[in-house]
Amino acid sequence: MSKVNKICGVVDSRVDPYSHRAAKVESREFWRWGSDNRLPFLLSEISRCSTTHRRIINDKADYISGKGFTFDTEQQLLSEFVAQVNSSGETLRQLLNKVAFDKALLGNAFIEIVTDSDHTFLSLYHQDATRCRVAKDSEHILLHHNWNNFSSKDAVSLPLYPKFEPQADGTLRSIIHYKDYEPGFEHYGVPPYIAGLGVSAIAYKTDKWNISRLDNSFQPSGVMILDEAVDNEFDAERMVHNAEERFSGKPGQVMFIVKDGSEKDNSRFLPISASSDGDWEALHTQATNDIVVAHSWFRSLSGLDYSTGFNSERILHEYEVALNTVILGEQAELLEPLREVITAILGVDASSLEFVNRPPTRSKPIYMKVWEARRADGLDYDPEDERQQYYLSEISKYNVTKIG
């Protein structure tokens, strides 16, 4: 009977996006986005692996895209455009929510502008930033469905705004490229949280560690020595597979060793003990705190409580800080070129177009009137102004566009 020594440890099949190693890509047609031109896909994958990281990106996009818009209601054409900006039936708010999400996630976002030579219509379309690359002339954006297998004949080239170029369907098209400035990066923006990728990896791996413990039914890891004689490699493989299903809970948590059998069965399990639970929990807590800082964001605005719990005053205070340091600046960047496009193509004054921002929790009773709320906030108010006679309960649900 032959002697077979078999050691088996099953490796976790889940791909770790943080261990990505890029292969450099060169092209004469576009500027690569990352050394392998796949940085946006990597950032997208990372956002799907870290709960806190993803929650902050979602919340930033929601806050930046606001709760609606105020504008001059006498501009009927402007009102209709805000209600539907393209043939897909999207509102301006829905469009800008996608744009704000891309910009928060990737540091870049794109809006396609469609019109004709007579400016008889205007449509705006969000373009998935992962499909866009800056052309080598730095004056066009290339759109392609598969950057793993780029083909110039399948790519669509659009000029950067304010230039327009005619297309095969008779329309004139252009594209707006929003990007977060970063020294040394000319063609693409860099997301503000880039310095926090390391701590995002820690949060991801601590989550993965907890999942592994759960899959293993919280059994200790260790080495299982099976005292059994086998005739060939196939029998050894079968024995290890059966033992995995019986003992390991989750493949990869237990290493199996099959050794030559003897008259006495000396099979035994040798646990590998560790007392590092506290270290992992502290790492996860610190990583969560650092992710919030890297995003220039605030804990209470993303459902992350403090040791003292949630407090409405703290939420309102952090919202005010976020509004003045992050939200308003991002909103201004998004709206400025759109106001210009609307005015130039539709011929209406879009200067009155502004976001409506509301805190995540009410700070005033809903039975107050608008002029009373403005007085309480130290703003100009007029008790005789008809527009300020609405109760807060009314404008939180209806007629948002009528409040100046």
Q: Whereabouts are the PLM-identified features?
A:
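Helix N-cap / loop-to-helix initiation motif
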Residues: 296-298, 369, 380
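Short secondary-structure junctions
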Residues: 249-250, 346-348
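Surface-exposed loop-to-helix/strand elements on domain peripheries
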Residues: 218-231, 255-333, 347-363, 394-404
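Generic, well-ordered alpha-helical scaffold segments in large soluble proteins
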Residues: 242-246, 286, 290, 294, ...
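Structured, contiguous alpha/beta core segments that scaffold functional sites
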Residues: 1-262, 286, 371-404
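A general alpha-helix detector
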Residues: 287, 322, 337, 369-372
